[in-house]
């Protein structure tokens, strides 16, 4: 795969989704940096996840945006930034772009969903409800194991075969356990967030998996239609595009079109 060196932002922020952490990007980060030599990736965790797992997760995304900005200030990293954000992380990016458009030069939103452009049964496909409710019930009865949870998440979010990933995710779960209370608080924040009616002032690209088993591709299609921003679809990858097809994702990050509201 040819390296990409032109017209690509140099300072990237990567954000994951609900109860996921920066470690879940796995080998995609070094792969991206190897393909885009001038780019530097900064991984952020949302409060309650990853290195910040001991903090209380906010129930509003505004506080998550401010946490991201504070983490970057603490690290001495000044804007502007480009953002790659997955799922709930994309909601954080959208609010960031709305409140502080001068800080972002590009946002790439992957397999996300937002009110009022997505129905509740599109934001989480009904076939996953039984799995999640069963695991929650077993968790309350102290019968669900971490391996059962992570294996279920892997099945719901990927379309490929990734046996090595499960062990890596179990290690992350042990190192940075997300509390049930924080998971519910994050779910609340994602559920009540309402996307701005006006398309972002920041150049925006939507990426989605046509066969996403977790979130319906209709969510990204609805957002693309409402905002009149480009949407590129992967024909067979699952929700976790970075895991299922990192080559395709890098290609879109470097050459996919973006549209600005300016």
Where are these regions (language model features)?
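Catalytic histidine-centered segment of alpha/beta-hydrolase-like enzymes
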Residues: 237-250
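Short beta-strand/loop motif that positions the catalytic acidic residue
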Residues: 200, 206-208, 212
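Active-site loop/oxyanion-hole signature of alpha/beta-hydrolase fold enzymes
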Residues: 42-84
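Flexible "cap/lid" loop of the alpha/beta hydrolase fold
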Residues: 98, 105-139
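Conserved alpha/beta-hydrolase catalytic His-Asp/Glu region
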Residues: 142-197
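Conserved HGGG/HGGXW glycine-rich cap/lid loop of the alpha/beta-hydrolase fold
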Residues: 7-54
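Gly/Ala-rich beta-loop-alpha elbow adjacent to hydrolase catalytic centers
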Residues: 85-89, 93
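Conserved alpha/beta-hydrolase "acid-adjacent" motif
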Residues: 213-219
């Amino acid at each position: 795969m040819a390296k990409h060196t032109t017209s690509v932002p140099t300072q990237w922020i990567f954000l994951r989704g609900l109860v996921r952490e920066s470690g879940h990007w796995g080998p995609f980060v070094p792969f991206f940096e190897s393909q885009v030599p001038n780019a530097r990736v900064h991984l952020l965790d949302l409060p309650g996840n990853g290195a910040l797992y001991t903090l209380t997760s906010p129930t509003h995304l505004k506080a998550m945006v401010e946490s991201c900005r504070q983490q970057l200030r603490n690290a001495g990293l000044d804007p502007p930034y480009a953002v790659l954000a997955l799922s709930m992380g994309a909601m954080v990016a959208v609010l960031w772009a709305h409140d502080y458009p001068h800080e972002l030069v590009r946002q790439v939103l992957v397999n996300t969903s937002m009110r009022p452009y997505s129905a509740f049964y599109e934001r989480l496909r009904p076939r996953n409800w039984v799995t999640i409710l069963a695991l929650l019930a077993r968790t309350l009865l102290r019968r669900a194991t971490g391996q059962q949870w992570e294996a279920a998440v892997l099945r719901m979010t990927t379309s490929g075969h990734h046996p090595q990933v499960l062990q890596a995710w179990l290690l992350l779960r042990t190192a940075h356990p997300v509390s049930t209370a924080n998971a519910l608080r994050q779910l609340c924040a994602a559920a009540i967030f309402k996307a701005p009616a006006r398309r972002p002032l920041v150049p925006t690209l939507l990426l989605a998996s046509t066969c996403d088993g977790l979130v319906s591709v209709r969510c990204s299609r609805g957002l693309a239609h409402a905002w009149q921003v480009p949407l590129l679809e992967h024909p067979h990858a699952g929700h976790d595009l970075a895991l299922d097809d990192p080559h395709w994702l890098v290609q879109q990050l470097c050459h996919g079109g973006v549209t600005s509201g300016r």
